[in-house]
Amino acid sequence: GKTVQEGGAVYNFTGPQGFGIANMADSLYAIRQLVYEEKKFTMEELKEALAWNYGKGLDEQSVKEITTGILREMTESGAKVDADTAAAVLKSVMNAQMAPEKMARYQEIHDMIAEVPKFGNDIPEVDYFARDVAYTYTRPLQNFKNPRGGQYQAGLYPVSANVPLGGQTGATPDGRYAHTPVADGVSPSAGKDVNGPTAAASSVAKLDHFIVSNGTLFNQKFHPSALSGREGLEKFVALIRSYFDQKGMHM
């Protein structure tokens, strides 16, 4: 045989991971319904609401962008910009207060988004929308080769990275507040699957798990009392069997 260094490896693939599919799907679905179909608010209003974290204040990235913009304008106008000036501008932006009517509007936008159907409730229109959204990552990846000339095989599981990644991510159009965890693997966003575990499993099973050859991960949490006794065990087994009968991958 050959060593790995001599080209003896049997498998030659790289498996990059994607996650937050539910956030992406719920965000785009909310935009389609509220901005383009019902015209409840504009994209510009939504961008402002996100920058202000739905009324909870500017997020860190927005503070940096606004501060940089102000300093750039000052420099272009010929004003002297030193470290003290930059610090003063940064402090001013961080202390900026939102007008009460703006804060109320951003909260109203958040409330409207909360009422939009979400992935994880066995609603075909939403679930197949999520399936198409996942394809925007999985299909293009097939067109590239890794540095060794092998395949890229898409994966959709976070290994808990959804928590630190969410901590670095601003507010999203699905109603998620800045710096909170994004969705875990292919699971629905936390608290958004309100029709029970069977409905959530049916939604996740509608994703194309075959194309995600590096694996998907569907996580669910149960209170022990929900699975207690013989009846609880039988229900748990039925849920798992149903998920795999629908071509789910990893639960």
Question: Model-found features: residue ranges?
Answer:
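Acidic, glycine-enriched catalytic cores built around paired aspartates
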Residues: 1-251
